[in-house]
C-alpha cells in the first residue's frame, strides 16, 4: 500500500548506500553517515514499486546531533530493576552508557541518593558501554527510599559538555515469545535502604593474571553473623568478555568457596573490575548483597604448544612428544601435565618439569595389549606456573594418538643348532624421542 514506504540513499552517479523498509515503526527511518563530499539522492518508493495520486510522501533530513543517556540491565529478566541496599552492606547493578553520534570518556553520577548512602565511581572508558556500579549504605543509615536519576556527562570539547539522563524501559504486557506489547519509559530508578543482611561477602584479590586458554580460581569468603547457617548462592554480576564461569553455593556449614574462571583464546587483554552477588533466604524472602571490586587481569598465554601425531601399537610403550616452550621468562615452578590419554592407557610420569630453555617434552605412555585401536584426538596439556603469588594455569590441545593393531610376525624358518651367542654389545645411548615428522624423515632416508 501507499503507507508501506521504502527509503533509500544513493550517491549520484553511483550505487545505493543505505535503505530502510519501516521495520518496527510506522515510518521509514535511517541514520546515514556521509562517506565523502558530493551529491546524494533520497529515494522514496512503494514496497512493490507502484505509484499513484495517493502516493505522497514528506522527507525530513536533519544533521544528527550528539546525544547521551543511561539505561540499567535487569538482574532478572523481565523483572523491573530496583536497588535494595542492606544497611552496612552493598548492592550493585549494571549500567549502560548510551552514546549517539559521539564518543569519548563519560561519567555517570547519581544525585539525591537516600541519606547515608553513596555509589562507586561511574567513570566509563571511551571503548566501554557498560559499567558496574556499587551502592553502599552506612550501618546507621535510616530506612528510606528514593527515585533517583542516573545522570551522564560527556565533554565533547572544553566549551561543550553533553548531559544525559536515565531512560529505562519497563515492560507491562508481554505477548507470545515475550514480545514487548506494552510498557513505559521511566527516568528514575528506585533505590531503598533495607534491613541489614545476616552476612557479608568478599573476594580475595587474585595476585596472578588469568591467561588466554587458561583458568583461575577465585577465593570467596562469607562472614556470617552468629547463628546464621543458611546456604549462600554466589554469582558474578557480569563476566568480562571472553571469561566464563559457573555460579557456586556456599553450604550452610561453611564460609569459603572457590569459583573457577576460564579464559577463551581471544579474551581481550585488560584489567577488569569484577564483583560477586550473594543471595540467601532470610525467612521472609531472599536478600542479595554485593562484594567490593577486585581487579582481574587478563594476559597473554604463557606456553607455546606444538602437537604432532603419535603412532603406537597395542602392547608397546610409546613416547608422546609435545613441543612446548615459554613465551617469556617466568618465576616459580613450571610444569606440564598430559591429560585425556586414550582409555586404558596411562603415563607413569604424567607431569614433567619444564626447563627454562626446553623446546619439547616426552611423556612415556604404556599401551596395554587390550587397548582399543583407533585414532584419539582427546589429548591436551595443562601448563602451570606456581610461585608465592599463586598458580597460572593454561590448557591447550589437542594432540593426536593413533593406536594400531601390531602386524603378525612371519612364521619362523627351521634353523640349525645355533652357535654360542657372542657377548652382547654395549648398550647404545638412548636416542632423543622423535616427533612423527622426524620418524617419517628417518624412514624415508632408509629407502
Can you say where each PLM-predicted feature lies in the sequence?
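Short edge beta-strand/loop segments characteristic of extracellular beta-sandwich folds
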Residues: 92-98, 136, 217-223, 262, ...
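C-terminal edge strands of extracellular/lumenal beta-sandwich accessory domains
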Residues: 2-16, 30-96, 101-102, 151-173, ...
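Short beta-strand segments of immunoglobulin-like
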Residues: 79-85, 204-210, 248, 306-313, ...
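Short proline/glycine- and polar residue-rich coil/turn motifs
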Residues: 22-25, 33-36, 113, 122-131, ...
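Short glycine/proline/serine/threonine-rich loop/turn segments at secondary-structure transition edges
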Residues: 51-54, 139-149, 159, 265-274, ...
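Short, hydrophobic beta-strand segments
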Residues: 31-34, 132-139, 258-265, 363-371
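Short, solvent-exposed loop/linker segments at beta-strand-coil boundaries, enriched for Pro/Gly
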Residues: 7, 110-120, 236-246, 338-349
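Short solvent-exposed strand-capping/beta-turn motif centered on an Asx-Ser/Thr pair
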Residues: 47-50, 86-88, 96-102, 211-213, ...
